[in-house]
């Protein structure tokens, strides 16, 4: 899948109005994506009580939001000329943003996950962030967070990137009583397991 086709697929998956039937139709168009999704759903990462044999089964068992999340990840992971570590970095950021949102009682945890994940989309697509975002149906809140660290999601993303760089004076978005080290370690552990299921290399140990 070339970059244009991949971006078009991701844009379809990220539409706010995507429903159960839409998602099944989008995924079923790509045999490789369908196969990889079913293989991943049946992996040890999910440890489901029974084998999933169809896309509809996957949707029923995991729910629309989860299937959309993992299908988007697979589409992003399909680039053959990018290091796996780049996707793993996106997974770590996504999970840490989500964990911070969860700790602060934010309702839109999926939006925080998406913000963290797509913070690497410019590197994955070899183009500027603003150009990529023109093709994606994101809310202005997520666009502002990715471009300028605006709003609550932007502040959380900025804190995650600051921790990544070792700039520990810029962690103001972390909830009181939370340990950045602990949250990052949880994110790395999750990303390691998830990337293994997606066929990526394991994440490096947290420093």
List where the protein language model places each region.
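Conserved alpha-helical "signature site"
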Residues: 1-207
């Amino acid at each position: 899948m070339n970059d244009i086709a991949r971006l078009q697929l991701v844009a379809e998956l990220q539409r706010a109005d995507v429903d159960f039937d839409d998602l099944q139709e989008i995924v079923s168009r790509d045999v490789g994506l369908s196969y990889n999704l079913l293989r991943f759903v049946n992996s040890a990462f999910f440890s489901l009580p029974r084998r999933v044999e169809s896309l509809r089964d996957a949707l029923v068992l995991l729910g629309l939001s989860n299937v959309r999340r993992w299908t988007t990840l697979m589409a992003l992971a399909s680039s053959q000329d990018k290091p796996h570590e780049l996707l793993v970095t996106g997974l770590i950021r996504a999970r840490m943003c989500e964990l911070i949102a969860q700790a602060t009682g934010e309702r839109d945890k999926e939006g925080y996950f998406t913000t963290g994940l797509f913070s690497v989309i410019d590197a994955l697509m070899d183009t500027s962030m603003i150009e990529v975002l023109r093709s994606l149906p994101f809310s202005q809140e997520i666009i502002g967070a990715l471009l300028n660290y605006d709003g609550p999601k932007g502040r959380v993303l900025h804190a995650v990137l600051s921790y990544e760089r070792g700039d520990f004076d810029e962690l103001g978005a972390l909830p009181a009583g939370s340990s950045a080290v602990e949250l990052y370690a949880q994110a790395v552990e999750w990303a390691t397991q998830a990337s293994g299921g997606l066929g990526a290399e394991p994440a490096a140990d947290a420093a």
